[in-house]
Amino acid sequence: MSGLTGALGLIQKLLGRKAPEVSMEELRALRRVLHPAGDPAAREALYTPPTSEAQKLTDNEFNRRMIATEMQKKLDEVPTTAFYRSDNSLAGAYQLSPDKWDTDLAYLLSNQPGLGTQLLEDAYKAAKQLQPDRRVRLNAIPGSEEFYRKQKQYGWNEGVQEGMPVFIRRARGGLAQARRAL
């Protein structure tokens, strides 16, 4: 099962139930289907080079607005920091999910050179204020993995969870240090 057809099938199946419970296996399947890296056609479309410089700008604008829109939808669910400059020089957003062992940074985007690293550091500091003893995990936006690989000097390490690339920065001291000592 892959692509939009698979996602719609899973959603219909979940909505048709009388009981609202959803198993972890079903959530993983839905994540694989909805995540563009899980669908070869979507993955190919993501990496298709733009036909012209004008098209590239249009695509960048579309991506910024799409992520900003997605962030707006989630503002009520999870604490989110999002910003967008009207001069199109920068769009940035991060989302903190404190309900798990890891603090997740689900979205992070910057389209201006040099500001991505600062946004990442700001998001990390916000996550550490939220839960000082927990490590911080970042789910990279497909196609942005190279940027995060360059952040290793700041303590970010690449891993894979459920077949998806993630970047984790461990907590300094506290519970994380105690677990390593065991």
What are these regions (language model features)?
Residues 97-112:
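Conserved acetyl-CoA binding element of GNAT-fold acetyltransferases
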Residues 73-92:
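Conserved beta-hairpin
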Residues 105, 135-140:
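Conserved hydrophobic beta-strand within the GNAT/NAT acetyltransferase core sheet
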Residues 16-73:
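Short amphipathic alpha-helix that is part of the acyltransferase structural core
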Residues 112-127:
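Conserved acetyl-CoA-binding loop-helix of GNAT-fold acetyltransferases
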Residues 1-8, 13:
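Hydrophobic, membrane-inserting alpha-helical segments
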Residues 90, 132, 140-165:
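Conserved active-site alpha-helix within GNAT-family acetyltransferase domains
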Residues 8, 15, 25-26, 173-175:
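Glycine-biased, low-complexity coil/linker segments
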